[in-house]
């Protein structure tokens, strides 16, 4: 009798479990998206308190845009209170000139373009001097800065397969020329450190590596080696202004980033694609922003208007536990820093005006 009763209970439990919707029985981690029951004050921000310069943007096809397309882009910028967009994908030569002319024709003063370096002929013994000369021509054609992509230091090699390091002396004429011309070098080196770590349950970027397996990096050269080359480059050229992209991949270690900023007064940084790191440490980050308020620039990286709202909310409010927009970057919730107005002004536009030549200052408040 007892055996029959146990069997009946087992059948009922099995039937009950089987009747559950499939998503209640089993779920992939990335599908889990609970809706918070927390009831707190909410202050969404859809337009920045002050006009801002986006110091890290990419508009690769802007030279081909029609007047209507440029107008549409400018309207989206206006809705965000973005006064100036810095296009880091300016290219070089005729490509750059076309972008400069097109934006000045349809939206004067609203776009700034950085030149880029073509490393295809890096084996040429005179490569550094030739690249520096091309940079000078690009600046004469309207470039206001130089952007270096992460391929330098990780992917670009000499013919013999040797990695071209960021601080390779062969490239020194480029950085010296930038300093001579008075333009900043925004340089993206490396990737988040977890890309070099085991892809296991302890890795904060596990989901991103699952989505993009090609982002997983081999152990050598290590993250420390690659980023060490980057910081050494900045040390070697104290008369050149460098903007270390993505918080130098130290948004998770602001103390170390602060030490580097203390050591190298020619180093600035920006927030492209790393605001999720700031939003999980509001008190530490607020102290950092106040201490280094003269060295941080607003930057976003990809242009998706609604995503800027998260940046504004983190900067301008003290809101608690609100969502980020991309799970692979941050599976945690955000908190606002409620930055002082003077810090906001510097991050939004004053620091950019100080180091990027040619920005129209009349687009910003006098104070």
Which sequence ranges carry the predicted segments?
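Bacterial N-terminal signal peptides
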Residues: 6-19
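An N-terminally biased module of ancient metal coordination in phosphate/nucleic-acid-related enzymes
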Residues: 23-109
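Active-site gating/metal-coordination segments in enzymes
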Residues: 26-29, 34, 96-213
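Alpha-helical scaffolding within the catalytic cores
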Residues: 36-41, 68-73, 94-103, 130-134, ...
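Acidic (Asp/Glu)-rich catalytic clusters
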Residues: 44-47, 74-79, 98-111, 133-143, ...
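Hydrophobic faces of well-ordered beta-strands that scaffold small-molecule active sites
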Residues: 53-57, 84-87, 112-115, 146-148, ...
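Acidic-and-aromatic substrate-binding clefts and catalytic sites of carbohydrate-active enzymes
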Residues: 60-69, 87-97, 120-129, 156, ...
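H/E-rich (His + Asp/Glu) clusters that bind or coordinate divalent metals
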Residues: 218, 224-232, 237-367
């Amino acid at each position: 009798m007892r055996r029959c009763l146990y069997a009946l209970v087992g059948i009922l439990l099995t039937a009950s479990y089987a009747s559950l919707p499939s998503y209640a029985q089993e779920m992939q981690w990335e599908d889990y998206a609970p809706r918070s029951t927390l009831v707190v004050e909410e202050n969404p921000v859809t337009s920045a308190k002050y006009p801002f310069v986006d110091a890290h943007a990419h508009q690769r096809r802007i030279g081909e845009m029609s007047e209507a397309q440029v107008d549409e882009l400018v309207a989206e910028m206006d809705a965000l209170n973005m006064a100036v967009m810095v296009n880091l994908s300016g290219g070089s030569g005729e490509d750059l000139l076309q972008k400069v002319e097109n934006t000045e024709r349809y939206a004067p003063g609203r776009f700034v373009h950085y030149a880029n370096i073509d490393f295809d002929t890096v084996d040429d013994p005179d490569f550094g001097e030739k690249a520096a000369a091309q940079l000078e021509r690009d600046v004469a054609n309207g470039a206001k800065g130089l952007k270096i992509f992460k391929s330098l230091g990780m992917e670009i090699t000499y013919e013999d397969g040797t990695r071209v390091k960021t601080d390779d002396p062969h490239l020194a004429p480029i950085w010296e020329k930038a300093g001579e011309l008075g333009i900043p070098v925004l340089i993206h080196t490396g990737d988040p450190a977890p890309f070099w770590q085991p892809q296991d349950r302890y890795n904060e970027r596990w989901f991103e590596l699952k989505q993009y397996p090609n982002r997983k990096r081999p152990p050598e050269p290590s993250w420390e080696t690659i980023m060490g080359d980057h910081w050494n480059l900045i040390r070697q050229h104290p008369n050149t202004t460098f903007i270390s992209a993505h918080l130098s991949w130290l948004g998770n270690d602001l103390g170390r980033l602060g030490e580097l900023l203390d050591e190298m007064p020619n180093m600035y940084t920006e927030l492209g694609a790393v605001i999720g790191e700031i939003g999980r440490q509001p008190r530490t980050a607020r102290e950092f922003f106040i201490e280094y308020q003269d060295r941080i620039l607003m930057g976003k990286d990809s242009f998706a208007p609604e995503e800027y709202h998260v940046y504004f909310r983190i900067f301008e409010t003290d809101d608690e536990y609100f969502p980020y927009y991309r799970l692979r970057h941050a599976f945690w919730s955000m908190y606002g820093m409620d930055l002082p107005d003077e810090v906001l002004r510097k991050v939004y536009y004053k620091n950019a005006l100080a180091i990027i030549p040619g920005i129209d200052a009349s687009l910003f408040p006098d104070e």
